[in-house]
Amino acid sequence: MIDVCPLLTLGYTRVKPQLPSSLASHLLPRRRFVQGLAAGGVLLGVSHFARAAGISSTNTSTGAASVLSGTEFNLEIGESPVNFTGNPRMATTVNGSLPAPTLRWREGDTVTIRVKNRLKEATSIHWHGIILPFQMDGVPGISFTGIAPGETFTYRFKVEQSGTYWYHSHSGMQEATGVYGAIIIEPAQTDPIRADREHVIQLSDWTDEDPMRVLAKLKMQGDYYNYNQPTVVDFFQDASQEGLKTAIDKRKMWNEMRMSPTDLADLSANVLTYLMNGTTPAGNWTGLFRPGERVRLRFINGAANTFYDVRIPGLKLTVVQADGVNVEPITVDEFRFGPGETYDVLVEPKDDTYTVFAQAMDRTGYARGTLATRAGLSAAVPQVDQPEWLAMADMMGAMGGGMAGMNHGGSAQAAMPGMDHSGMAGMSAGGMAGMDHGSMAGMNHAGMAGMDHSAMSKDKASSTVRHARTEYGPSIDMRVDMPRTNLDDPGIGLRNNGRRVLTLADLHTVGGAMDPRGAEREIELHLTGNMERYSWSFDGVEFGKSTPVHFRYGERVRVILHNDTMMTHPMHLHGMWSELEAPDGSFQARRHTIPVQPAQRISFLVTADALGRWAWHCHLMLHMDMGMFREVVVA
């Protein structure tokens, strides 16, 4: 007989809170959660708005958003009934559509967009990745006051770029409830990316629950929706493969750290339905093609909370654009992208059908559609990959072979004596004792606006890790003292899957950097949080307690982001390009949204050529809402 009592000390003591009986009675079968309804979607069509606004509809795909093109646009934000899971709900929609209509612009034109608010609360539209005057950026409290109920706001700006972008609300939880759509900008000159046809593929996620209730549950228990917790069966499987001692030690370590090795995403398929162009997996969005054509697929991650891993079994993907900017073509089998990012890929289908498969990073579900020669066809849908545990490199960066590189602020002291748990007066990094990063004399952290290293090298980011005093407190559950700086890691779940996976190191912007100057100074910020308390911040300071980050107008500044958490954060700076650097300081790629992996330290250059007030935040909506947000002032 096996005595299972010792297993209670190995991470099996947590019990999910019991749901109220009124809610439990409405729980859906897992298949319904993952697949959704075959006909699930917006119940109120766009016909009324189409007649009023002259909306055209694409005729080469089924389930695609309507398309508006030109220079004058009228958008109305209101509510529409939807049903993705069998439970009718109200969504927040644009012109009665989810996703919102695709907007097609032309580089060099001046566009005018009138946005009417038919909600009972304020709303807004942010033009994600678009370079424009800050007054047109659409962030309430930063660039304008928002659009009050019943009011109309007119956005007007010149289009200075081309490529694939998107737009979404920046008010409350409206992005999560449906206010998002694609933007396609035709270049002023001939497009160097040649294709016979194209499809916009916008991925998103949907929850039947009120997003504020979801957030309240996460505040109660940070891993509330994590249904991939280690089980007794997993323990015995690991013991047989790795040995009993290794299996026990691994679980003991995680349990003493009070962290979950499988907490890759805040929300899972147990509360989310994954959508492709507003269509459930069972609904099967379909993009048409003729065999032998070169097809351009414009992928947009418009999800509020989901990283997607995208592949099309049977087809190679040639990545030609990232965040709307052309890159040197790179052929892969798969790519990962987070909320806010976009990728354009070319494919050349030969057969009748292919599945467009986008599995969530935590492997609890997927979005899917079909490329087909005619409507009604479908191809085999792959099984989701097995979920993986976070690796040591995801916790400690460059110190992945030992435990000296991470500081847990009081937890796991007995098991990991090489870590500093004594009140965080200094820094423990296995041989760097005596370096006091609690006082850091000479650095000004009073404003919590990031560390300014004005004297640093112009050619390469500094390598010394500096933690602000504000990182030493209850709102922080870990600090990484020796982060990894490599860009060639595809991330957890993709490292050894047998497929060629895109990494940041593969991306090289055509034409090089926009600004040849080196950095005049450095600003370092740490991405911080406490997963158990579900709080997120920069340098341990939530947005409501922070002061702005200041850029001097016209300067070339290097920004260093250091991820002191075990989650990947897609970081989005409004109004200016982020020019990603390789570890050796060379230019890599121009981005508007950069994913920063756990225990990773990245750097990018910014030319502060956009006067005004701008937002800078994690694009995981709940992280942003809980404090991982800063204002940037360019003056």
Where are these regions (language model features)?
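N-terminal pre-domain segments of enzymes
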Residues: 55-69, 459, 465-487, 492-501
